Amino acid sequence: MFKKYITISLIFSLFSFAGDKGIERSGVMVTTATADKEQKNYVVKRNIPDECKNIPITNKMLWTENFAHESVPEACKSTYVHTKGKLLSMHLDEDLETYGELEVLYFLKEMQHNDQMLLIDSRTEKWFNYRTIPGAINMPFKYFEKKDEYNFHFEYALKHLGAFIQKDGEYDFSNAKTLVLFCNGPWCNQSPRMIFALLKIGYPAEKLKWYRGGMQDWLGAGMTSTRE
């Protein structure tokens, strides 16, 4: 029954994407709190400078040198460290969906009027404060992976996820929120470690989504971040 539901959801999602091809350009309005506890508005979208719009998609322009051609304007290209971590599989669990950039955008859009949805940056605080996806909240993976060591932070975070520990010590996930978790990139294991820690205590797999590409793929696609 669950697999049938996933299939129907996937078909629905494909039709939704087909009917709204411009969301990556029009964007999603997100209000988030800054490190100074102030409210800030972002239009989360794919940011493409005007001088980048007419570059032809050819081998010469995209895959020469390192890798963009020297004639491509600086505003249209970025460099990234690609030698860290270990590449991860596309799927962490058979009941857990893997998201791409468009799925995250649609999630953000619905999240603005649905308090049962959360975008989770599972990296440590210094990474989150430096740059993240607008609308994300920070819950470091270590609070869940080492819950006995970070007991106060773990229980506080758990309540924010809509779950709690009952008097008998059992977990209650009856009101658990739907989460999308991410970290630095497809080579980063912090969000998978948090996901596995959540699964270990019984968090419903169908309420966990993994944005595998993380910040590297997000920025690589020219998407809005909290660092201007």
Residue locations for each model-derived region?
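Solvent-exposed loop/turn segments at secondary-structure junctions
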Residues: 124-127, 143-146, 185-189, 214-218
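Sec/Tat signal peptide C-region and signal peptidase I cleavage site
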Residues: 14-18
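Positively charged, proline/Ser/Thr-rich regional signature most characteristic
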Residues: 89-177, 228
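Sec-dependent N-terminal signal peptides
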Residues: 5-13
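Flexible, polar/low-complexity N-terminal or interdomain linker segments that lie immediately upstream
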Residues: 19-130
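Active-site neighborhoods of enzymes that stabilize oxyanions during catalysis
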Residues: 221-228
